C-alpha cells in the first residue's frame, strides 16, 4: 500500500486528489493508497445532514474561518481542522475483504489498537 503524507491541506484539494487516485485504481494503473492529512478548518455535511444542523448561523461560522461544504459521503456533520489527523484509505476492495462493512470494521479496530498504544481512549460506535 502506498502512503502519502500530505501535511495540512484544503478539503477540496484533498477530495480531488482522492478522486484521481480512485480513478487510477479503477483503471488498474494505481496502487492502493493511504493518505494521511490534516485539514484547514472545514465542516462537511454528508447526505443525511442539513445546513440547519449547524449549531451557529453559517455566516458566523465562515466569519471564524471555517468552510462549510456539502459532500457526497454518507452520514451527518463532521468537523475537520488543524491538529486532527485524518486518514483516507483508497483501495480496491477485491484485494481485501469484499464486504465494505467488514473492511471498515477492520480499519476501526486497527485505529483503536493504535490509539491505545498511545494511552488514548477510544470507542467504536455500534460495538
What does each model-identified segment do?
Residues 1-126:
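N-terminal lobe of the biotin/lipoate ligase/transferase fold
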Amino acid at each position: 500500500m502506498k502512503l502519502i503524507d500530505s501535511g495540512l491541506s484544503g478539503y477540496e484539494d484533498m477530495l480531488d486528489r482522492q478522486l484521481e487516485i480512485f480513478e487510477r485504481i479503477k483503471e488498474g494503473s494505481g496502487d492502493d493508497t493511504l493518505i494521511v492529512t490534516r485539514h484547514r478548518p472545514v465542516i462537511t455535511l454528508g447526505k443525511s445532514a442539513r445546513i440547519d444542523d449547524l449549531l451557529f448561523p453559517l455566516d458566523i461560522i465562515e466569519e471564524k474561518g471555517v468552510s462549510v461544504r456539502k459532500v457526497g459521503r454518507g452520514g451527518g456533520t463532521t468537523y475537520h481542522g488543524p491538529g486532527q489527523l485524518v486518514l483516507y484509505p483508497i483501495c480496491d476492495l477485491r484485494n481485501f475483504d469484499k464486504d465494505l462493512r467488514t473492511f471498515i470494521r477492520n480499519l476501526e479496530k486497527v485505529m483503536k489498537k493504535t490509539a491505545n498504544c498511545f494511552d488514548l481512549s477510544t470507542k467504536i460506535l455500534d460495538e
